[in-house]
């Protein structure tokens, strides 16, 4: 079982950086502007990150030719997926959840910079149970029940 409160603390400074970027740039820009701003903010805050990390998913242990790119991996265990759209949908959440599962990362942040107030959603992946967990502890998605 994962410890939600310690994971919330782990992502806190990344979430703070996200809000700082939105505070400076404001709403309504395109995604790449916010990604560049976040890269600068992470660097200034000395938060370790990799931008646009590419990976090949696997099918039954065999790497596929398909390539996925994650916007940011912070602190080696936090997937950050940036959007600049009118509304976040279930498909955007599914994208983040799959990145977390495929990369075996415990924390995921889905951010929508487009609205007047940035929308930040945090999720956690329990590697033991293969479940996505919300910040309040309830199971959002169970990969064992597909």
Language-model region placement:
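Helical mechanochemical/support elements of P-loop NTPase systems and associated helical scaffolds
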Residues: 10, 34, 92-95
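Conserved catalytic cores of phosphodiester-cleaving nucleases, focusing on short active-site segments
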Residues: 26, 70-88, 99
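Active-site metal-binding core of divalent-cation-utilizing nuclease and nuclease-like domains
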Residues: 27-77, 116-128, 137-144
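Interdomain/boundary linker segments immediately adjacent to catalytic/signaling cores
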Residues: 1-25
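Nucleic-acid nuclease catalytic cores
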Residues: 83-132
């Amino acid at each position: 079982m994962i410890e939600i409160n310690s994971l919330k603390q782990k992502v806190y400074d990344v979430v703070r950086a996200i809000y700082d970027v939105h505070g400076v740039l404001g709403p309504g820009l395109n995604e790449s502007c916010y990604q560049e701003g976040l890269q600068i903010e992470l660097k200034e805050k000395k938060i370790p990150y990799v931008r646009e990390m590419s990976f090949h998913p696997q099918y039954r242990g065999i790497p596929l030719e398909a390539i996925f790119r994650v916007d940011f991996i912070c602190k080696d265990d936090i997937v950050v997926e940036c959007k600049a759209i009118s509304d976040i949908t279930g498909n955007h959440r599914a994208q983040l959840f799959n990145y977390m599962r495929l990369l075996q990362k415990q924390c995921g942040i889905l951010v929508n910079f487009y609205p007047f107030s940035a929308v930040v959603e945090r999720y956690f992946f329990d590697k033991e149970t293969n479940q996505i967990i919300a910040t309040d502890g309830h199971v959002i998605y169970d990969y064992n029940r597909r």
